[in-house]
């Protein structure tokens, strides 16, 4: 059975609590989702803070935008894989998922990368609170 893990700090993380992900069309089990609890949320927040203080925080806005465009390109490259997963997970028909959901997922990465890259940075400058 497929396990859907949390991705925290560059690693896939299993948890002690899972639930079945069932296809809405026929109720078959698609896999087990590892539910994030307080420990996983805290670990994800700590990993985000480390990334902000590390390479990601030192990376230029242009480079970050390039990486987000690369994510969009990878979604498009693996279009059929994402399409099959979306249809199984949501029960949406091929016509809807292939013309709206997957293209929009890829487009969102590009749009927000371009907005940040092309917007005046002074409107986004702020201190990130550290616990």
Question: What is the role of each PLM region?
Answer:
Residues 1-131:
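N-terminal Rossmann-like NAD(P)+-binding subdomain of aldehyde/semialdehyde dehydrogenases
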């Amino acid at each position: 059975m497929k396990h859907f893990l949390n991705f925290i700090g560059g690693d896939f993380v299993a948890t002690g609590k899972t639930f079945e992900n069932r296809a809405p069309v026929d109720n078959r089990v698609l896999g087990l989702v590892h539910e994030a609890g307080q420990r996983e949320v805290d670990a994800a927040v700590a990993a985000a803070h480390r990334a902000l203080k590390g390479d990601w925080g030192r990376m230029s806005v242009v480079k970050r935008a390039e990486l987000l465009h690369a994510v969009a390109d990878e979604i498009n490259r693996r279009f059929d894989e994402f399409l099959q997963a979306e249809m199984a997970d949501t029960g949406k028909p091929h016509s809807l998922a292939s013309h709206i959901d997957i293209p929009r997922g890829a487009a969102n990465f590009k749009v927000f990368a371009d907005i940040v890259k092309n917007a005046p940075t002074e409107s986004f400058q702020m201190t990130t609170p550290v616990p």
